[in-house]
Curated annotation (Swiss-Prot):
<keyword id="KW-0630">Potassium</keyword>
<dbReference type="InterPro" id="IPR011037">
    <property type="entry name" value="Pyrv_Knase-like_insert_dom_sf"/>
</dbReference>
<keyword id="KW-0460">Magnesium</keyword>
<feature type="binding site">
    <location>
        <position position="258"/>
    </location>
    <ligand>
        <name>substrate</name>
    </ligand>
</feature>
<feature type="binding site">
    <location>
        <position position="259"/>
    </location>
    <ligand>
        <name>Mg(2+)</name>
    </ligand>
</feature>
<dbReference type="GO" id="GO:0016301">
    <property type="term" value="F:kinase activity"/>
</dbReference>
<dbReference type="InterPro" id="IPR018209">
    <property type="entry name" value="Pyrv_Knase_AS"/>
</dbReference>
<feature type="site" description="Transition state stabilizer">
    <location>
        <position position="233"/>
    </location>
</feature>
<protein>
    <recommendedName>
        <fullName>Pyruvate kinase 1</fullName>
        <ecNumber>2.7.1.40</ecNumber>
    </recommendedName>
</protein>
<dbReference type="GO" id="GO:0004743">
    <property type="term" value="F:pyruvate kinase activity"/>
</dbReference>
<feature type="binding site">
    <location>
        <position position="87"/>
    </location>
    <ligand>
        <name>ATP</name>
    </ligand>
</feature>
<feature type="binding site">
    <location>
        <position position="48"/>
    </location>
    <ligand>
        <name>K(+)</name>
    </ligand>
</feature>
<keyword id="KW-0067">ATP-binding</keyword>
<comment type="similarity">
    <text>Belongs to the pyruvate kinase family.</text>
</comment>
<dbReference type="InterPro" id="IPR015806">
    <property type="entry name" value="Pyrv_Knase_insert_dom_sf"/>
</dbReference>
<dbReference type="GO" id="GO:0005737">
    <property type="term" value="C:cytoplasm"/>
</dbReference>
<feature type="binding site">
    <location>
        <begin position="48"/>
        <end position="51"/>
    </location>
    <ligand>
        <name>ATP</name>
    </ligand>
</feature>
Amino acid sequence: MPALINPVKFMRPLSHRTKIVATIGPASSSVEVIRQMVDAGMNVARLNFSHGSYEDHATMVRLLRSVEQEMDTPITLLQDLQGPKIRIGQLPGGEKQLREGEKVSLVPVEIGDRHPGAVGIDYPHLATEAKVGERILLDDGLLEMKVVSIQDPEVICEVVTGGILKSRKGVNLPGLVLTLPSMTTKDKQDLEFGLSQGIDWVSLSFVRKGEDIHTLKQFLAERGHPDLPVIAKIEKPQAIDNLEEIVAVSNGIMVARGDLGVEVNPEKVPRLQKEIIRRCNVRAIPVITATQMLDSMIQNSRPTRAEASDVANAILDGTDAVMLSGESAVGQYPVKSVQMLRKIAEETEVGLHLVNNPPIENTETHALSEALVVIDGILDLKYIVTFTTSGFTSLLASNQRPSVPVIAFTPSEKVYHSLNLVWGIIPFLINEEFDTFEDLIQQAEVLLRDRKMVEKGDQLLIMAGIPTKIPRGTNFLKIHRIS
C-alpha cells in the first residue's frame, strides 16, 4: 500500500456550519488581526475592489496566504468587482449641503467645470435617459432628489430629503433601465490583476441578467481560468425579474441587501432574501447574505438584538454564509464582529432542522444525495465524507443540510478553497497516491484519527464516484465504522 495521504492543508473542525465572510480593510489589515479573525471563525476574506490600490490588495493577498500557511487552515479569497456603479464626482471641499426644496443641477463629471455650482455624476447618459418625476437616490438612499426638468446635458432636481452629500458617494436610479456594460474597463483590469494573485472566487456587482454572467465567464475562459467560480450579486430590480436565469448560470449568489434595499425599498428585502436563498438551495449553489448584518458593531462592541435576529433568520432561511462589510473593514471591533457571527451561528444551528432540498435532476448523484437524508435521520453519524475532484458531490451533500459536517477530500487546490465557502463543509487537500478505493478510505480514516476528529466506533457515511481516478458523477454510498 502506498504512503498515507499527505494532506497539504485541511480545515480545522467547525464549531459553526454557516461560513463567515469578512471584508478586509484598514481595520483588519495587520497580521495579528487576521490571525485573530481566523481564530474567531472567518472562512472567507473579501477583497473589495471598489477601494484600494493594486499594491494594497497584493500586500493583503500575501498576508492572507502567509497566515493560511502558518495556521494550516484555508482562507478563501473572494474578489468583489465594483461593477457599473454610478458615483458623484469630486465636490469642492469634499462635500455639499443639500437642503429640502433646493434645486440642484446634475451634469456629467467631464463637463462639471463648465457648470459652476452643479454636481458632477459619472454617468454621461443621465440627461437622455432620465424622466421628469423620477427619483434619484444618493449615499445608499439617505439623500433623495426628484427630477423636475431636463436641459441636456443638465438634469435639474429638487431635493426631497436633504443632508450632507460627500464626494464619490453612490447614486441609485431605481426607475431607470440603464445602458451600462455588465463589466466596466476597471472591472476587466481589476480581474486581470486578481487572476494574477490567485483569487478563489470572483463576484460581479449589479448583475441584471444571465448574459452578464456569461460575459464574465467568457472573459475568464479567454484568460485560461474557465473553472473559476463566479458569484452574481443580486441588487437590481432587473436581477429580481431575471433571477431564475441568473441562478442557473452562476456558481454562487450574493444577496447584496444594501443597493437592493435602495433600489426596491427596504420593506421588500426580507421577502426577496428568502426567495433568493430558496432558489439557490433548490439549485444546490452557495448563497451569501450580506450588508449591515452587524452594522452597529462598526462603532459598538455589541450588536443590537434586531441585528442578532437578522443574522439568525438568514441562517434559518438557508444561507451558506453571512458577510461582514464595514464591520470588519473599517469598524472598531473587527475580531469581535467575527466572534459574534460565529456565536449567533452556533446558537442558531443547535437543533437546526432545515427543510431538505429536493433533487433537481433524475441522476445517480442526486438520488444518492436524497438517500443521504434518510441514512442521516436513522444512524448516529459522525461525518458525511465525500471524495471529489470537481466539488459537486460535496455541494449536493451540503445542500441537504445534514445533521453532521461534510468532510470533502479533494486533490484540487481550487476545489479545496472554493468549498470553504459552502455551508457545513470541512475541506481537506490531499494527493492522489493510492491504489484502490479501499486504500483511500483506510488512509482517510488514519488522517482523521491523527487529527483526533474520530475515534473507534464512529460511523461515517461515504459518498464518491468510483473508479475514483475517472471523472464521473457520484455512484457510491457506504456506511463505514472506524475500526
